[in-house]
Design a protein with these regions (language model features):
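Beta-alpha-beta core module
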Residues: 90-97, 101-103, 163-210
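Flexible hinge/capping segments at coil-to-helix
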Residues: 24-25, 93-104, 108-130, 213-216
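A late-sequence structural motif
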Residues: 43, 191-230
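Central regulatory/effector-binding core of bacterial HTH transcription factors
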Residues: 26-90, 150, 158-161
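A short, exposed helix-loop element centered on a Lys and neighboring polar residues
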Residues: 13-21
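Secondary-structure junction motif
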Residues: 128-150, 211-219, 229
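Short, well-ordered beta-strand segments
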Residues: 30-34, 82, 107, 131, ...
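Basic, amphipathic "hinge/linker" alpha-helix immediately C-terminal to the N-terminal HTH DNA-binding motif
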Residues: 1-12
């Protein structure tokens, strides 16, 4: 733990040195974005690319992790901006909500009997071995979707990273409820839920904290671009 904290302090010191090195007419330094596995990151990547056209000396670093890890890193200053999937507590943060929604569904093996269905309903999953996300707020959202079938949920594993989740499905552990990622093994398939369940994403940064000129300028760029497409 002490080694981890020491490394965090070193990373923060490096970011401060980069931030102080910028000139008045040229933004410099590194903007660190924390993100889980989400298709929404591709949209943020386009914002980063358009920002760099005007500010070519700014670099971006993407730090992958689950929501709790990203929030911790925002708190300790090693991540500037986070992409968090809802539902999530954002009371400590300034934020902008992205318009793009991601659909929930079930990842299963292609030899599963349910693979022949176009959509998956709560009754289809009653009594089936299921793989859930670890985050309690997300699990509550899924359990609400089950409605009257909630008592028949059979959770056999929990996982947060899509690659590891797919490995569990491929190995025959169970069916995984997750967001569509378009990244599957050839012998797996994704079936959307019915009724439909969608998840939004927010871009967050710490309230009442001074950020570097580069981060501040990028936040303004994000807001301006989102206003143009609203």
């Amino acid at each position: 733990l002490l080694k981890q904290r020491a490394q965090e302090i070193i990373n923060i010191e490096e970011k401060i040195r980069e931030d102080l090195s910028h000139s008045d007419d040229m933004l410099m330094g590194t903007i660190t974005i924390g993100s889980g596995e989400t298709c929404v990151l591709s949209g943020v990547a386009k914002l980063a690319a358009s920002f760099r056209k005007e500010n070519p000396k700014v670099m971006f670093e993407v730090c992958s992790g689950i929501a709790d890890d990203i929030k911790d890193k925002i708190e300790n200053g090693t991540v500037d901006i986070g992409l968090l999937k809802e539902p999530v507590d954002i009371s400590k943060y300034e934020f902008v909500r992205l318009g793009q929604k991601e659909k929930w569904g079930v990842i299963m093996r292609k030899d599963c009997p349910l693979a022949e269905k176009e959509y998956i309903t709560p009754k289809d999953l009653a009594g089936q071995p299921l793989i859930f996300a670890k985050r309690e707020s997300v699990r509550n959202e899924i359990e609400n979707w089950f409605g009257d079938c909630c008592d028949n949920i059979k959770i056999v594993a929990s996982c947060d990273l899509i690659y590891n989740t797919e490995s569990l499905v491929k190995g025959g552990v169970g069916l995984a409820l997750c967001i569509d990622s378009d990244m599957y093994y050839d012998d797996l398939c994704f079936k959307p839920l019915s009724p439909m369940l969608e998840t939004g994403t927010v871009i967050v940064w710490r309230k009442n904290r001074t950020v570097s000129p580069s981060v501040n300028s990028f936040i303004k760029h994000i807001k301006k671009c989102l206003e143009c497409i609203a």
